Swiss-Prot record:
Pfam families: PP1c_bdg (PF10488). Interacts with the host phosphatase PP1 catalytic subunit (PPP1CB) and recruits it to dephosphorylate EIF2S1/eIF2alpha and therefore restores the host translation that has been shut-down by the host. Also inhibits the EIF2S1/eIF2alpha-ATF4-DDIT3/CHOP pathway. This is Protein DP71L. It comes from African swine fever virus (isolate Pig/Kenya/KEN-50/1950) (ASFV). One of its GO terms (biological process) is symbiont-mediated suppression of host translation initiation. Interacts (via C-terminus) with host PPP1CB.
Length: 185
């Protein structure tokens, strides 16, 4: 087996990350298992780095440098006192700058540049209509829209009315036959 194959075989034999224990170079506080909720779920409690990432290092939080009595006002500068651009004084920055004049100047330069550009016309295969009104809008109840579907709808309503009318007449006849079957034979 060559040297390269030996290295590959060694790499395959390494333990998975969950079984790795802290090395002897770690401090004694990190060698002890951390007691937390994550300790019961898996072997994460024995690895202080994973416990710290997952928030299970409650026992190590006693050596914190944070003082609850110290206010945040003394540590963090308020954002309204911080200048984003110290090089320019904001009072004198826009002095002599008129938005309307600058906009007019930019537009004049733009028009002068593009008026000097020669645009040659090409033969185009697509032509658009020159009319102002390209779409003709009609109301939904226009006579032009009437068709065979409307006749079918009228026929359907007429037949429904006939069925209800004949049902009233025939129901009384059938009810009499049902009540007195001997009388009608």
């Amino acid at each position: 087996m060559s040297r390269r194959n030996k290295k590959r075989s060694r790499r395959r034999r390494k333990k998975p990350l969950n079984d790795i224990q802290p090395g002897p170079s770690k401090s004694s506080a990190q060698d002890e298992p951390i007691k937390s909720v994550s300790h019961h779920l898996s072997k994460i409690g024995t690895n202080p780095t994973l416990a710290f990432i997952l928030g299970g290092n409650e026992d190590l939080s006693d050596d914190s440098d944070w003082d609850e009595n110290f206010s945040l006002e003394n540590t963090l500068m308020p954002l309204n006192e911080v200048s984003l651009n110290d090089k320019h004084n904001s009072k004198h920055f826009n002095k002599g700058f008129d938005n309307n004049t600058a906009l007019h100047e930019v537009n004049t330069k733009w028009e002068a540049f593009y008026s000097s550009v020669k645009i040659r016309q090409r033969n185009v295969k697509v032509h658009f209509a020159t009319d102002d009104i390209l779409v003709d809008v009609r109301e939904a109840d226009d006579i032009d829209r009437k068709g065979p579907w409307e006749q079918a709808a009228v026929d359907r309503l007429r037949f429904q009315r006939r069925i209800t009318d004949t049902e009233e007449i025939l129901s009384t006849v059938f009810l009499r036959k049902k009540l007195n079957p001997m009388e009608h034979e």
